[in-house]
């Protein structure tokens, strides 16, 4: 069993095609996961990124952006082992593991809420997903076309 296991998901009401620009921005990685060294194992563009993690933890981490409805679910996974030894006393070791997991869950949630805030912008709660500005304005589409 992996010592550090984090799995989280957040729905982002924004076009899935907007995800890659944010989650693949290396400057943001430093802010989100500053103490970890990240080596890209798989860059999936708008669908996310997979890393090999080193530093205070060794393992794998992933952001997967799954298109759902008119937005996407941002999945965050971290599976890792601490590189420094845990305390030898069982209760202290369990407390340390709990704290390490909490720190990484909080960091993941802060990351996902930042992605959500950036991409949803001033979207009205309950309103349609924020469109991709690079795509044509749906209002300018041919009025005779039928959407299915």
What are these regions (language model features)?
Residues 37-43, 65-66:
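Short, exposed beta-strand/loop patches in secreted or surface proteins that constitute
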Residues 54-131, 148:
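Beta-strand/loop substructures that line and gate deep hydrophobic ligand-binding cavities in soluble
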Residues 42-52:
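Short, hydrophobic/aromatic-rich segments at coil-to-beta transitions
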Residues 18-23, 29, 49-51, 74-76, ...:
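Hydrophobic pocket/interface hotspot
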Residues 3, 46-48, 69-73:
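A generic structural signal for beta-strand entry/edge sites
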Residues 4, 34, 45, 57-59:
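Residues that act as N-cap/strand-start positions at coil-to-secondary-structure junctions
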Residues 9-13, 52, 64:
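Generic structural detector for well-ordered beta-strands
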Residues 1-39, 137-142, 146-148:
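Hydrophobic ligand-binding cavity/cleft-lining segments
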């Amino acid at each position: 069993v992996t010592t550090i296991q984090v799995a989280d998901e957040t729905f982002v009401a924004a076009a899935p095609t907007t995800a890659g620009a944010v989650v693949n921005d290396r400057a943001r990685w430093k802010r989100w996961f500053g103490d970890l060294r990240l080596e890209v194992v798989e860059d999936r563009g708008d669908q996310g990124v997979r890393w090999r993690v080193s530093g205070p933890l060794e393992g794998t981490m992933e952001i997967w952006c799954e298109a759902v409805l008119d937005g996407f679910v941002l999945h965050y996974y971290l599976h890792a082992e601490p590189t420094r030894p845990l305390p030898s006393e069982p209760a202290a070791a369990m407390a340390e593991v709990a704290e390490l997991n909490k720190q990484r869950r909080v960091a993941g949630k802060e990351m996902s809420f930042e992605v959500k805030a950036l991409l949803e912008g001033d979207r009205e709660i309950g309103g349609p997903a924020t469109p991709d500005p690079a795509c044509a304005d749906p209002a300018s589409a041919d009025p005779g076309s039928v959407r299915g």
